[in-house]
């Protein structure tokens, strides 16, 4: 006796997501880990530290290291929560139906005045 296999094909969604960038949120470093407690500093967002430019001979290495240090709390960027920011792309088929119905109403309201 043979079993039948049914395959259902689904249409792709009209919305596509693409990753635009990365943002770093609140600091999650536990400052009381050595004593067995839990204490965070309350830094809400990663702010890259700027290099002071005080005659550092390391040049680009010093600038890169400063970009990974938070100016607000002094922690490394890896302690901050990483948040990926997505861009939503819509298909033109969905938008064309809405714009065609709204454009005559706006033109008719202009002509009636």
Swiss-Prot record:
Keywords: Cytoplasm, Metal-binding, Zinc, Zinc-finger. Residues 97-113 have a biased composition (Low complexity). GO terms for cellular component: cytoplasm; nucleus. It is found in: Cytoplasm. Inhibits zinc finger homeodomain (ZHD) transcription factors, by interacting with them to prevent both their nuclear localization and their DNA-binding properties. The gene is MIF3. PROSITE patterns: ZF_HD_DIMER. It comes from the Eukaryota. Residues 93-113 are annotated as: Disordered. GO terms for molecular function: DNA-binding transcription factor activity; transcription cis-regulatory region binding; zinc ion binding. Its main location: cytoplasm. PANTHER family: MINI ZINC FINGER PROTEIN 2 (PTHR31948:SF169), ZINC-FINGER HOMEODOMAIN PROTEIN 2 (PTHR31948). Homo- and heterodimers. Signal peptide: none annotated. One of its GO terms (biological process) is regulation of developmental process. A zinc finger (ZF-HD dimerization-type) spans 24-83. This is Mini zinc finger protein 3. InterPro entries: ZF_HD_homeobox_Cys/His_dimer.
């Amino acid at each position: 006796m043979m079993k039948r296999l049914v395959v259902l094909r689904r249409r792709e969604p009209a919305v596509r997501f693409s990753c635009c960038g990365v943002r770093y949120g609140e600091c999650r470093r536990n400052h009381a880990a050595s004593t067995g407690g839990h204490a965070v500093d309350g830094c809400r967002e990663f702010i890259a530290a700027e290099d002071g430019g005080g005659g550092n001979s390391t040049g680009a290495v010093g600038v890169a290291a400063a970009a990974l240090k938070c100016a607000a709390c002094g922690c490394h960027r890896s302690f901050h929560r990483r948040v990926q920011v997505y861009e939503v792309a819509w298909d033109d088929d969905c938008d064309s139906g809405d714009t065609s119905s709204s454009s005559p109403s706006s033109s008719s309201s202009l002509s009636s005045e």
